[in-house]
UniProtKB/Swiss-Prot annotation:
It comes from Halorubrum lacusprofundi (strain ATCC 49239 / DSM 5036 / JCM 8891 / ACAM 34). Pfam families: CTP_transf_like (PF01467). GO terms for molecular function: ATP binding; nicotinamide-nucleotide adenylyltransferase activity. NCBIfam families: arch_NMN_Atrans, cyt_tran_rel, PRK01153.1. Its EC number is 2.7.7.1. This is Nicotinamide-nucleotide adenylyltransferase.
Amino acid sequence: MRGFYIGRYQPFHNGHRHMVEEIAAEVDELVLGIGSAGDSHTTRNPFTAGERVMMVTKAVEKLDVTTYVVPIEDLDRNSVWVSHVQSMTPRFDIAYSNNPLVVRLFEEAGVEARGSPMFRRDVLEGAELRERMIHGRDWQALVPETVVDVIEEIDGVERIRRIAETDANGTAPSDA
């Protein structure tokens, strides 16, 4: 059986890893969708799809399950979102998500969907990690070591700090 789990992974953290480990115990193969693949260089989405593919691939490489990491660009039409996802990924039998809308969309499309309890959601949340990076607080203990390596390789902390100096959309203020 092949499962599917989507996330923005901005960055991939230990909560994601915990969820992936739980799913891996239930499936033979796992498709990990990199959501919002077209977004990068903003405070909400500082990392590119390619950088997130590196993070996720390295973080799950030792799991005993065949894993496919697939970037998926946003589609602002919920009624056809599941078919968009299916067109971008290997076929899967079951979708996993903790997002009620995502679960509902898969169920309406006839795909079995399962949730999982959040793992340490109080600190294992992307916005919290990005804030810690911006303010120089410890974030490394909350992500797999391989993710720390990728973020250091791309100078990701400096990037997000620079982005945070601009406006809320991650774009430079206009001169007007």
